[in-house]
């Protein structure tokens, strides 16, 4: 009987490093005592590219708990940024826009689900594309002079109040 593979393991090495293995491949390193921010540049984890076809459920909150200064979103973005070979980073195509529109219509703003339906973009990319370009509820036309005068009549304190009133 084949056992299910644990998608991630976090361990501590003898030399004071936190090592995160995703699907059996070391992909994140962090010195435990380091006060410097945790940064992973290009080429830091070349081996994690080989796991791009692996499926599984990962608790990004749990992984981040072992990496001081990193959030669950940092870890998720690092993973997808280095392993998701099918992720487009250039301009959106008409087909992607159509898939995004249908996915939002069906799933709402559950961006992880929407991104899985779109298939070629990350959740953050889908959210930004929808909110900044495609959402039909947002008026993307140039501001009228009346709108500019109205918007400029508020102080920053008014905006804070309005944001909390919604």
Swiss-Prot record:
Major subcellular site: membrane
Induction per the UniProt record: Expression is induced by the azasperpyranone transcriptional regulator ATEG_07667.
Highest taxon in the source lineage: Eukaryota
Transmembrane among keywords: yes
Keyword Transmembrane helix: yes
Keywords: DNA-binding, Membrane, Nucleus, Transcription, Transcription regulation, Transmembrane, Transmembrane helix
Pfam families cross-referenced by the UniProt entry: Myb_DNA-bind_6, Myb_DNA-binding
Domain HTH myb-type: 84-138
GO biological process: snRNA transcription by RNA polymerase II; snRNA transcription by RNA polymerase III
Protein purpose: Specific transcriptional regulator for the azasperpyranone A biosynthesis cluster A.
UniProt-recorded name of the protein: Transcriptional regulator ATEG_03638
């Amino acid at each position: 009987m084949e056992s299910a593979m644990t998608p991630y393991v976090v361990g501590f090495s003898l030399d004071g490093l936190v090592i995160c293995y995703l699907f059996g491949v070391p992909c994140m390193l962090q010195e435990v005592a380091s006060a410097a921010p945790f940064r992973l540049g290009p080429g830091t984890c070349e081996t994690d590219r080989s796991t791009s076809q692996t499926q599984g459920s990962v608790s990004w909150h749990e992984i981040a708990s072992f990496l001081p200064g990193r959030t669950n979103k940092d870890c998720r973005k690092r993973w997808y940024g280095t392993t998701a070979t099918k992720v487009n980073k250039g301009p959106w195509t008409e087909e992607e826009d159509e898939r995004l529109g249908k996915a939002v219509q069906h799933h709402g703003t559950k961006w992880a689900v929407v991104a899985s339906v779109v298939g070629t973009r990350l959740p953050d990319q889908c959210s930004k594309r929808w909110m900044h370009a495609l959402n039909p509820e947002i008026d993307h036309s140039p501001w009228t002079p009346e709108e500019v005068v109205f918007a400029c009549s508020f102080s920053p304190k008014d905006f804070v109040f309005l944001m909390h009133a919604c």
